[in-house]
Amino acid sequence: FNVVAGDDVINSVEHGQAQVISGTATGASVGDKLVITIGSNQYTTTVDASGKWSVGVPASDISALTDGTVTLSATITDSAGNSSTQTHDVVVNTASVALTVNTLSGDDVINAAEKGEDLLLSGTSNQPEATTITVNLNGINYTATTDASGNWSVTVPASAVSALGEANYTVTASVTDNVGNSAAATHDVLVDSSLPVVTLNHFAGDNIVNAAEVAAGQTLTGKVSNAASGDRSEERRVGK
């Protein structure tokens, strides 16, 4: 038997594809018949002039295989009725790969202070220790590795964070396991580094408080821009 699916492992992508099973029959004659058995299915082919043989297994039959070791068998029969059988093991591994990205900057918002600092990207995966995680932010790839618990993290330098504009960005993390199964996860973060601006209205109409206005009491009013509804304002008294 030749190697199946490139590495004798059928991963989640290959599990949905047709596969070619092939090999070489030593000492066989042209036209000798081979029967390939995979589970309860059989496929028939013949040996060519070079002793080689191959058979296509449809995607529907491959996708019916369950995870674990599958033993393929090839039985060749010559013109005199003599037969010989060889086996070959293939592993089916379609286990799902899990990957997450944690909240960024505590609230998924990069404010003015945080825009001048390093940014930690982190998350979890079900992959073994030292698995490579590729993380992309603003078109730049960063590499992290999983620890023994599946946690991963990587630091985006302050220079790259400060280069971000005022916009929403998507962090994309991706991982591929040792048999080619892959997964990706995304997480959005908002860059909002515009500082609030406070404008005070004229106090008492003319910024002069006379005796009558003192007795009546006055309300301090104004407007705040670059702020969201519900943001808290604070009054500080200066002077007597």
Language model regions located:
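Short proline/glycine-enriched turn/loop motifs at strand-loop junctions of beta-rich domains
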Residues: A25-G31, S125-T131, S225-D231
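Short strand-edge motifs at loop-to-beta-strand transitions and within beta-strands
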Residues: G51-V55, G150-V154
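Conserved small/polar residues in nucleotide/adenosyl-binding loops
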Residues: E235-K240
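Surface-exposed, short loops/turns at beta-strand junctions within beta-sandwich domains
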Residues: A59-T69, A158-N168
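Short, solvent-exposed loop/linker segments at the N-terminal edge
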Residues: D7-Q17, D107-E117, D206-A216
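Hydrophobic/tyrosine-rich beta-strand signature of extracellular beta-sandwich/beta-rich modules
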Residues: V70-A74, V171-A173
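Aromatic/hydrophobic beta-strand junction motif of beta-rich domains
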Residues: I21-A25, L121-S125, Q218-V224
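Flexible, low-complexity linkers/stalks enriched in Thr/Pro that connect modular domains
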Residues: F1-V4, D78, S84-N102, D177, ...
